[in-house]
Amino acid sequence: MSLFSIIKDCGGIHNIQRVLIPDSRIIIEIHEFELLSAEAKQQAYNLTLKQVTYQQTVIENKDEFGAQLLEIGQLISDQQRQDITPYTAPVECEFRPDWHISPPQGLLNDPNGFIYHQGQYHLFYQWYPYTCVHKDKYWAHLTSKDLVNWQWQPVALTPSDWFDSYGVFSGHAISQDDLLMLFYTGNVRIGEQRDRHTTQCLATSTDGIHFTKQGPVVPELPPGVTPHCRDPKVIRHNDRWLMLLGVQREDEIGRLAIYHSEDLKTWTFIALCGDELGDFGYMWECPDFFTLNQQDFIVIGPQGIRSPDKSHTAPHHNGIVKAQLETSGKALLSDFQPLDYGFDFYAPQSLETPDGRRIMCAWMGLPDEIDHPSADNGWVHQLTTMRELSYDNGALIQKPIKELATLRHTPIVLSKDETSFDLHSKAFELQVSMQWGSVLRLHQSESGYCEIRLDSASRRLYIDRSNTLIREGDTVREMSLAESDSVQLHIFSDTSSLEVFINEGEAVMSARVFTDKNSTQLSFDGDVQIQACWLLNKASAPFIS
């Protein structure tokens, strides 16, 4: 018996949801029981999971089994691509951003595979197209020449194979001459208890558009680690390849696992890293690695650490640590600091541009928050703006990329005698100087606003979105600032977001801000000097191929 004959007995490829091969079994998850053949109905069947189970001993030619699995996966992928076609058309919504990346429909989360390859930028993101829930993720694919205007490409990866049928989870990309290589986590669930199985997988493309899955390249878990092992980042270091993985130890402590390889296909475990940080969260996600001004950094997403301020109640954090890579490949980590002090920033990825800049973007959301007003229109979440990173005089600096200046429309001249203005748009760039004790309100109308205030007594900056249409999540973020006479803010606003770069990029605060479509006013109390203001044009919609 071949795998193809099993598929036929189970109603054909159009009746197949997924194929799983745990232990010595072959599990076929189906859509309709009535389409099973009489022989298939004699096999063990789980009514709850709609799964038919065969023993692998029924396979006559074991040598062809692996190739047949990949071929079946490709057939399932072809069907999935047909099924998602209606969901690639963007739905209209008053909260749709003018110049940020958002999904046409469904749910967006982590950016993936952010890289410059063969003359253009590639950016992928986690996407579930059907509804606004976290489930069975795809890799959506965009390309750009300028990091501002993005073009939709065919979906790169679908959850179609035995090693990733419950989600092609996050990962990174490597550019090797003409070859674009995607490393990602394959997620699988087994049984009614939904036991998690994760492997680190590879897909390759010679044209940068169409990808062929190669299957797992790290098929086993690191020693002492739970199946919470994901998000591979591959780097070149000391003439060999290293893979960084976010993991959870069996004692539920987050750590970084590191592997090495000579050929990008065979990987050997080196070590778990991060003990010097102590008990630092129950899971680390989405590692990244880069060097700024001769200092190595690793980005981690520690879940469950202590929040930097009392108003931050979410367990999900993102930050950067200094890294010292030993010759063995093991990393010593120190000096964790948040990458963003706002509400909505997670799972960042970075790349190096041809002119040597380090550019980062992130998911402008958090894992547990999906009930946004846009969900009523069938989509949720967006990515942050692109930031340029530098390391100067011992400080990490983040600034908006210079390419954003191409979006500037006619400068807006605001009277120094007025304290309230109607910009007639939520898409704008604003440079202001605020004295302590002053308040700035944005996205304002009679129905609400978002407030930025400087508290003189505590020397803290607050962003307060409690007077907006927010449905879940924190409403206030705060951070301490160094002693100064004034605070310089460089603000980028879109239809439903604000990103505030503080004191020439010493800190950033990002926020999704939902207000009604007429909330286009700006006002302030106290000593606020508006230094420059531009309305921003729309970027190319990231849904158009």
Swiss-Prot record:
Catalytic activities: Hydrolysis of terminal non-reducing beta-D-fructofuranoside residues in beta-D-fructofuranosides
Can you tell me where the transmembrane regions are?
none
Gene Ontology BP terms: sucrose metabolic process
- According to the UniProt entry, what is the EC number of this protein? 3.2.1.26
**Family matches, as InterPro entries:** ConA-like_dom_sf (IPR013320), GH32_Enzymes (IPR051214), Glyco_hydro_32 (IPR001362), Glyco_hydro_32_AS (IPR018053), Glyco_hydro_32_C (IPR013189), Glyco_hydro_32_N (IPR013148), Glyco_hydro_beta-prop_sf (IPR023296), Suc6P_hydrolase (IPR006232)
Question: Under the GO molecular function aspect, what terms does this record hold?
Answer: beta-fructofuranosidase activity
Cellular component terms, GO, for this chain's entry? cytoplasm
Q: Which domain of life is it from?
A: Bacteria
Its biological purpose is as follows: Enables the bacterium to metabolize sucrose as a sole carbon source.
- Return the similarity comment: Belongs to the glycosyl hydrolase 32 family.
The protein here is known as Probable sucrose-6-phosphate hydrolase
Q: Which organism is it from?
A: Psychromonas ingrahamii (strain DSM 17664 / CCUG 51855 / 37)
